[in-house]
């Protein structure tokens, strides 16, 4: 081999090695460097330094699990910079190179959105692929809308608009409204649909009217309802008339609908109509009787239950008996059975109480009243000195309904405690990511570690993870609501050490509670605050109660003046520390006036101290449990149970061992 050939070969080898090295470096990247690049890019994005953010995200290695998320961020940077070509390029790279990634569907959808006007044929192709391959996603629902828009735009200015194409446009809008009646494109779907020069069915007008109502456009709803069939639309017409303050029409429609058209609507719709009627009532007992007399069997169990609830004590039991016999398998039939069960307990007819209670648990083991029935079967067994039986019922209540108010009462009974509060305190723990067993290699863990919460929200369907994201973003009330609803769906409930519980029962403002609770139980005050405001310092009720502990301004002003707390305006109640200080002082006054009885004080915090005094004088009870069950004001009875349920759960989750 001569010298020139050797030199050429050497140059080629060096070039190859250099190129391979560059290629290797672009694919392989140390984890530490990847995280640093992503973190810095995210920081620049939040600081609106989009050019630099785009560049840093582009440097994330191709082999990194974070690469598709970096590409998506690049597209968002390009969007902020007004660079449509780069935005489209990144979306296409994402859904072509990372087809298995959840973001690929979103990327294709966003690309389709961008092309609706510029390249409708390509946009339609993208939307069609989404509908076909991912039919159960929100992106598929929105793609239906855009498919209709693209077809409409193609033909609306042509001399011939075939009826078959109009049918396709109509079908696209119909599917969208059926699946997303409150979707972001819903009102546009209606307005575009109405431009089609074709006959629209009564059912479709009802579909449009329902969406308009959900968007609180009551006049438009009224206009659309005029084209519907009353037998199908009477409930919506009732609700819309109520919203328009047309009380006479709303009442007339309820009566007419209950008499003639209940078979055409769902039971829950009948309940809504009845509730509107009762909201307009000046004589609830009379109006319940009117509705009861005219209603057909469907949905009558709800009206019957209202009739029983409003009946005098001497007629109530017979009313519940008839309700249960006529609707033995319905929700309200089950509630009637539970009321009959407790009536036997009040009358000390334990033999029949046990029979009814056992029948209830056999038929409705997961019914709303199952924890109450199970607990009271334990109380009856204890009163009958049946040790093994009452121990079994109390333990079952705790095991099957661990986070329920009756689990708390069962624990008190098991331990033979004479007090309402437990001799225990909590050790505050922070809200954490809700799953312990997540791998550090999991991309979800990496995104959480990088605090890329918006990206996490896009890539997860887990409600607890979403709750955690909202908490990290400072949306505490929203976080709790999402976690609470998610936990209600879990059967059985997870162990008390499960991190998901901390999202349902987070600890906020506890230092301030400790500082100002005085002789009040700090855990109980935490529970009260949770139920009053979900830790929203700016909460304001319809009657004017304000802040974390939902204090009425006049009451708060009186307490502040009495103790010299320095409240100068009602808006001061939105200041967390002052609200907690005044709220604890107020609760302490209630507690002192009610012989240090916390259940009575909690009832008074909601229903008023005068009401509690009257109830104690008028209700026959032998212990705390009988008193709570017989609080005549349903809101207060439920409030007491909610607060002590929260109290119990805070102790379960955070108890200081």
Predicted feature locations:
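Short, functionally critical alpha-helical segments immediately adjacent to catalytic or ligand/cofactor-binding
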Residues: 520-537, 580-584, 599-607, 643
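Short, flexible loop segments at boundaries between secondary-structure elements
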Residues: 636
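Catalytic and binding regions of secreted/periplasmic enzymes and modules that target cell-wall glycans
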Residues: 589-618
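Acidic, polar-rich low-complexity tracts and alpha-helical solenoid repeat scaffolds
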Residues: 2-543, 549, 557-562, 568, ...
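A short, structured beta-strand-centered segment in the mid-to-C-terminal lobe
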Residues: 568-578
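Acidic, low-complexity, intrinsically disordered peripheral segments
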Residues: 409, 629, 639, 644-657
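Short glycine- and hydrophobic/aromatic-rich loop-to-beta-strand nucleating segment
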Residues: 549-551, 580
């Amino acid at each position: 081999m001569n010298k020139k050939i050797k030199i050429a070969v050497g140059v080629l080898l060096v070039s190859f090695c250099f190129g391979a090295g560059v290629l290797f470096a672009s694919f392989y990247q140390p984890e530490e460097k990847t995280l640093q690049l992503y973190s810095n890019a995210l920081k620049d994005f939040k600081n609106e330094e989009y050019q630099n953010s785009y560049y840093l995200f582009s440097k994330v290695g191709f082999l990194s699990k974070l690469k598709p998320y970096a590409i998506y961020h690049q597209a968002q940077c390009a969007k902020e910079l007004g660079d449509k070509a780069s935005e489209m390029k990144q979306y296409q790279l994402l859904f072509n190179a990372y087809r298995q990634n959840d973001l690929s569907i979103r990327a294709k959808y966003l690309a389709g959105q961008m092309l609706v006007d510029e390249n409708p044929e390509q946009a339609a192709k993208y939307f069609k692929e989404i509908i076909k391959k991912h039919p159960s996603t929100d992106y598929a629902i929105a793609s239906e809308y855009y498919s209709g828009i693209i077809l409409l735009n193609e033909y609306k200015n042509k001399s011939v608009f075939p009826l078959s194409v109009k049918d396709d446009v109509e079908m696209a809008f119909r599917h969208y409204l059926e699946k997303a009646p409150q979707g972001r494109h819903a009102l546009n779907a209606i307005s575009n649909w109405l431009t089609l020069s074709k006959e629209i069915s009564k059912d479709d007008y009802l579909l449009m009217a329902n969406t308009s109502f959900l968007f609180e456009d009551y006049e438009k709803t009224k206009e659309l309802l005029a084209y519907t069939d009353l037998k199908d639309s009477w409930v919506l017409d009732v609700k819309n008339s109520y919203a328009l303050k047309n009380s006479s029409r709303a009442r007339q429609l309820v009566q007419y609908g209950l008499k003639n058209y209940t078979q055409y609507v769902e039971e829950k719709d009948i309940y809504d109509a009845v509730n509107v009627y009762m909201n307009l009532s000046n004589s609830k007992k009379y109006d319940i009787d009117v509705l009861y007399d005219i209603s057909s069997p469907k949905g009558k169990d709800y009206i019957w239950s209202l009739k029983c609830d409003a009946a005098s004590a001497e007629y109530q039991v017979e009313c519940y008996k008839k309700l249960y016999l006529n609707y033995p398998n319905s929700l309200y039939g089950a509630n009637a059975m539970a009321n009959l069960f407790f009536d036997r307990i009040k009358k000390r007819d334990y033999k029949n109480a046990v029979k009814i209670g056992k029948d209830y648990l056999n038929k409705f083991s997961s019914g709303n009243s199952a924890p109450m029935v199970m607990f009271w079967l334990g109380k009856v067994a204890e009163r009958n000195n049946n040790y093994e039986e009452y121990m079994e019922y109390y333990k079952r209540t705790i095991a099957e309904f661990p986070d329920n108010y009756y689990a708390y009462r069962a624990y008190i009974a098991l331990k033979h405690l004479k007090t309402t509060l437990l001799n225990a305190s909590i050790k505050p723990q922070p809200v954490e990511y809700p799953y312990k067993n997540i791998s550090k290699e999991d991309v979800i863990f990496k995104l959480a570690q990088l605090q890329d919460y918006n990206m996490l929200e896009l890539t997860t369907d887990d409600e607890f993870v979403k709750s955690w994201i909202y908490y990290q973003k400072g949306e505490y009330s929203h976080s709790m609501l999402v976690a609470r609803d998610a936990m209600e769906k879990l059967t059985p409930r997870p162990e008390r050490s499960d991190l998901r519980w901390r999202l349902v029962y987070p600890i906020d403002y506890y230092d301030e509670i400790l500082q100002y609770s005085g002789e009040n139980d700090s855990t109980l005050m935490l529970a009260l605050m949770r139920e009053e405001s979900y830790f929203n310092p700016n909460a304001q009720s319809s009657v004017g109660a304000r802040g974390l502990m939902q204090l009425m301004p006049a009451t708060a002003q009186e307490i502040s003046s009495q103790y010299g707390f320095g409240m100068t305006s009602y808006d001061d109640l939105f200041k967390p520390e002052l609200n907690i200080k005044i709220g604890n002082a107020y609760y302490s006054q209630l507690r002192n006036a009610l012989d240090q009885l916390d259940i009575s004080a909690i009832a008074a915090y909601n229903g008023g101290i005068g009401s509690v005094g009257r109830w104690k004088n008028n209700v026959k009870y032998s212990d705390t449990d009988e008193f709570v069950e017989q609080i005549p004001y349903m809101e207060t009875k439920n409030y007491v149970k909610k607060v002590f349920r929260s109290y119990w759960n805070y102790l379960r989750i955070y108890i200081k061992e």
